[in-house]
Amino acid sequence: MLPVFINLLRRLYFMRASRESAAYHSLPKEGISMDQSRAPIMEALENFKDMRIVPFDVPGHKRGRGSPELTAFLGQQCMTVDVNSMKPLDNLCHPTSVIREAEELAADAFGASHAFLMVGGTTSSVQAMILSVVKRGDEIILPRNVHRSVINALVLTGAIPVYVNPQMNDRLGISLGMSVADVKAAIEKHPSAKAVLVNNPTYYGICSNIREIVKLAHAAGMKVLADEAHGTHFYFGENMPVSAMAAGADLASVSMHKSGGSLTQSSFLLCGPSMNAEHVRQIINLTQTTSGSYLLMVSLDISRKNLALHGKEIFRKVVDLTTYAREEINQIGDYYAYGSELINGDTVYDFDTT
């Protein structure tokens, strides 16, 4: 009797899921993807909870019942929405409904042609970005002070790095951005390079002249990739350094969890109009998990909504607080919290005051 009962539950579930999927696809899409007050993954999870489906699928904690101690620690709400891919909730590898809509909303919020929800951290985003544009033997121009994910991507692809050595600030002991002249020289010396990678900003808040670098690279037929692990707020704050998408970059990896409010390990990969989004998705699917965490995805969805609606206000307050903190620290004596006074129009073209 148990197999019959299970099959009956499955039939009832998929009948309802099919109706909901059909209802979604019958909705007019114009305007929906622009409504930044929506969070489609969150909405789908709320609806899913109301369906009260008996779980015969992974994960094995069965929405918390199978692991009381973990449920007590994380909370029932968290365990209830830690679920597997299914029709009402879409599929991260090949999204067609709510995840696809969340991607469209993110792309609109960030000013990109397409956005991918990444659940392997910005490390996986950076690696997918590089894998999308270079292969074994191709050259890629990049600064020496890149993240280890970039180096690992070079190992995976077999691409050849052409390093641009950033200048150093000897007083602070930190590396700066790439000089436009040095990037231009690298492009001229390596005209067959496929791409230029830029940190926007560096870990220390230093920004190169990414607009000019984009112009130089595109004129030479090269793609521009931006590691924006620390630059989420550039897209939403006022009087911030220019974002990679606004500067015309082709791909950008954005650590939403670092300064955008989502859960640790969640990120976005942004595409400009020159990129084939489906090709990029294929590359992502080479390495990204087939068991995408809905906790991470819904955190991206909700955080994007929050920044799209309230980002200016949030980061205006952040700038005010950091400016106050910097001024107070610099009055103590023997301490120096550096700021926009480092800007020199080249290796420090702009500075992230947050």
List each model region and its residues.
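Hydrophobic alpha-helical signal peptides and transmembrane signal-/tail-anchor segments
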Residues: 2-8
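Conserved N-terminal alpha-helix of the aminotransferase class I/II PLP-enzyme fold
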Residues: 79-121
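Conserved PLP-binding active-site segment of the aspartate aminotransferase-like
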Residues: 352-354
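N-terminal "arm"/small-domain region of PLP-dependent enzymes with the aminotransferase-like
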Residues: 28-97
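Conserved PLP-enzyme active-site core in the AAT-like
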Residues: 41-46, 52, 70-73, 94, ...
